[in-house]
């Protein structure tokens, strides 16, 4: 009779241990699941060049006038001091990559040629920092060029 009580106690403890381990494993597996994915941000790099800035460039401008208008170039060709590159790259977290490049060629101290690559006609849209997912295309706050400090 003592052996039967001892066996039933062992079985009860074993069942309790099995339930505890099963519950722990299940909770661990479920905790890795969530509705929201990994948080991603839009990553903008380089010189932001707008169409308004590019349109103000005129052949014959001096290097200093170009720097005053555009800022310092992202790249100066190491073997050709006559070429400046203004590169802008927007790696959208929930989309593709948008890249623009403006290559300026000088003759001496004067701007001689302007070469555009990419779509300068519209400003790049960067995701709203307060959101969790992709930018809603109707959300004007996601556009840095239209953002105002009083937007809340």
Swiss-Prot record:
Q: A single GO CC term, please?
A: Bam protein complex
Record-linked Pfam families: BamE
Q: Where in the cell is it found?
A: Cell outer membrane
Which parts of the sequence are annotated with region: Disordered? 114-152
| Record lipid sites (N-palmitoyl cysteine) | 33
Q: So what does this one do?
A: Part of the outer membrane protein assembly complex, which is involved in assembly and insertion of beta-barrel proteins into the outer membrane.
Q: Which family does it belong to?
A: Belongs to the BamE family.
Q: Which HAMAP family match?
A: OM_assembly_BamE
Q: How does it assemble?
A: Part of the Bam complex.
Q: What is this protein called in UniProt? A: Outer membrane protein assembly factor BamE
Q: Which organism is it from?
A: Halomonas elongata (strain ATCC 33173 / DSM 2581 / NBRC 15536 / NCIMB 2198 / 1H9)
